[in-house]
Amino acid sequence: VGVYAMQIAMTEAFKMKLTVEEADAIFGRPMGIPKTGVFGLYDLIGIDLMADVLKSFIKELPKTDKFHEVAQEIPLIKKLIETGYTGRKGKGGFFRINKDGGAKILEALNLETGDYSPSKKIDIKSEKVDLKKLINRDDKYGKYAWSVISKIIKYASSLVTEITDEFNDIDEAMRLGFNWSKGPFEMLEEIGVENFFSKIDNYDGNKFLENLAKSKNENFYGERQKYTKIETLGKVKRKAQSIDGNSSAQIYQFKDYNIVEFTTKANALDYDSMDALKKATDKPLIIIN
């Protein structure tokens, strides 16, 4: 779901001719997503590593999975990888730091020309606006937000019963795994069930959405689960025993589980990071950075 969300945010930005700054400004804090957005997150993870992730999903997911619709190779991304622009760990990516002349200037990639120019700060005046207002805006930002959010909700809901029987498990995975402040179904509840269904064209055979539309239940989520305070991983790590590691990650053992801590610049993932994860999977695993 998380990778699908990244891909739909990227492909829609290309389709709607948004700049990378505009896309990240919308697919970011206004939607309860970290400020790296989509293009900044691609740079952080590594554009080449994301290409490998997509190839893996294309190979493993059934042909009927709608992920395939957003996983096609983009020529500009292929060119970036071939020329060493793999993100923060490389010469740059969708963003880069230009040090010519002594000053450090943040530059952004033009998705149409492939050229760099000084990055522009985008103020869409939606930092404190709720999702319902954001998707109802009658401008390119509102149209982009709605297109991305609606497709994420459709995709996530199509996986209910296939990957989990409880839809809130998907929300929790997105909060914990991608650091979103709200998952797809929490977004749906914030948008409003009636408002959502008034804006979509069809259910695409989605049983979850069909049943929800029939129920007309605006508060389908119910009461949220409350969590008790737990010990931080930073404190746990200080008590753990270092058992292995490499230039990109360190492996610790604590009680009956392993901990992997990434140590690369900006926590960028590379092949040594993946090797450390592979070595640590003989026990229950916690990943920190």
For each of these PLM feature ranges, what is it?
Residues 1-288:
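N-terminal glycine-rich phosphate-binding loop for ADP-containing cofactors
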